[in-house]
Amino acid sequence: MKNKFKSVAESFFRIFIVRYFFRMLIKLGSGCGRVWTFAKVRALVDIPKGSNCHWSVVFKYPENIHFSGRVMLSPGCVIGAMSPVSFGNEVRLSQGVHLETASLDVNGDLPYKHIAKPITIGDGVWIGAHSIILGGVSIGKNSVIGAGVVVSKSIPENSIVVGPGFRFIERKEKY
């Protein structure tokens, strides 16, 4: 109970500081978008030291995003984490990559309800530009996802996946 209270208190403090800082930036005028985004990312998402995170990266539900080690998040990435998203060490997301844990339950009544499944990305994974990773997917360590691939099912370790047909082109040799 004590740890939960501490966690809630820390989150509240971070959000309070970010909002206060945001008001200060509004007073400063235009051109402060980068500073605001950097402050927002650092306050709401616990990114490990040595990581690179472009200021244009969008985090939805940042409390569900967990990093195990260094990551590189390129411009235009969107991480929608209604359910947990876990990153391994030395993970690279190229420009415009989307990770989305939520989808709609179209079998139910209107309005459709959101359902969310976790995403797990292993160590040493490289995801190519403009790829989309959907909920319920686990990407094994040392895998490479080519540009523009929509990943809707799990990928084993040491795999290379390319093309719109989700083709495994080869298994990488272990290091």
Question: How would you describe each model-predicted region?
Answer:
Residues A129-K153:
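Beta-rich strand-turn-strand
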Residues A39, K49-S51, V57-F59, A147:
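Short, functionally important structural connectors and interaction interfaces within domains
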Residues A43-L44, E63, K117, V151:
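Extracytoplasmic/secreted proteins and extracellular or luminal domains
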Residues N52, M72, W126, V144, ...:
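Short-chain dehydrogenase/reductase
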Residues S56-F67, M72-S138, P164-F166, E170-Y175:
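Flexible, glycine/small-residue-enriched loop-and-beta-strand segment within the central core
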Residues M1-L44, P48-G50, E90, G124, ...:
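Terminal amphipathic alpha-helical/low-complexity segments used for targeting or macromolecular assembly
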